Amino acid sequence: MEQHIVLTKNLTKKFGKQTSVSGLEMKIKKGQIYGFLGPNGAGKTTTIRMLLGLIKPTKGDIQLFGQDIRKHRLQILRRIGSLVESPSYYGNLTGRENLEVIRRVRDLPEARIAEVLEIVRLSKVADRLAKEYSLGMKQRLGIAAALMSKPDLLVLDEPTNGLDPAGIHEIRELIKELPDQYGMTVLVSSHLLSEIDQMATQVGIIMNGKLIFQDDIEELRKKQKPLLKIGANNIHEAQSIIQKRGLHVKLQEGNLWISETSPEFVSEINGILVQSGVSVYRLEEVKRSLEDIFLELTGTEGSL
């Protein structure tokens, strides 16, 4: 039984003197949606290209379905569907005709076209020219093409990039259905934390070519321990009073932040500040977002 659909060891890719991916240890379980998260230029697409055999690693090993890609490349790739960057299609052919081209090349059953059109919800527009499709419909056509061979692993590189909110929602809901309804494992990359949060069951965060976090999405959410937000008339004096009691407090955007939020602690801190002549006008428990966790993990100050 395959423990991991994707398993890499010390996966590294250099372009000249520049290291794009460094020592990557990716582990993707069967039947999961693995969200591969990182800012543009972090190494996501380079990693995906290595997994698909499009470029060779500088060093390291790649196992897909328990097999070494160097020894069983063609056998492995038959079990993978992919959409890397933008979809490829013939604009002067209909959506159905585009899939017919793929069906003939791969010698697939004719019925498969109708099946994938239904999966990606393009059945009603299947006979329109592909060049007349919206960007979201073109993305779904690209996913349909990737699904033609009934892959065990579907690899999608930034599938929601450039889409409007409605298009993003359509792609997200489509991806979420694939493991349960069709038994697929999905690797989806994105620079949008909110997208990964809403559809992934596993997450890997890559930064400057290095995987800095990898676990179930729930483990990432467990890091969302709430903080106590304090607003006071003399914020610097309040900070000094709290620090003198040996507590770690952070001043940010005119408010103090403390990691302890128990009712007893909040009451005690409020009493200490008031007795010291500090007028407290805000005591608020704030749950940290996943973006806050990302910034903490990466040590960056900006958003994805």
Model-found features: residue ranges?
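Phosphate/oxyanion-binding loops and surfaces in catalytic or ligand/nucleic-acid-binding neighborhoods
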Residues: 105, 300-301
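Residues at or immediately preceding the N-termini of alpha-helices
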Residues: 69, 73, 217, 235, ...
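Short, charged/small-residue-rich alpha-helical element at the C-terminal edge
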Residues: 228-297, 304
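Short, Lys/Arg-enriched, disordered terminal segments
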Residues: 1-4, 301-304
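Generic structural signal for individual residues within well-ordered alpha-helical segments
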Residues: 77, 99-100, 114-117, 169, ...
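ABC transporter nucleotide-binding domain
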Residues: 172-260
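ABC transporter nucleotide-binding domains
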Residues: 3-8, 13-188, 193-207, 211-213
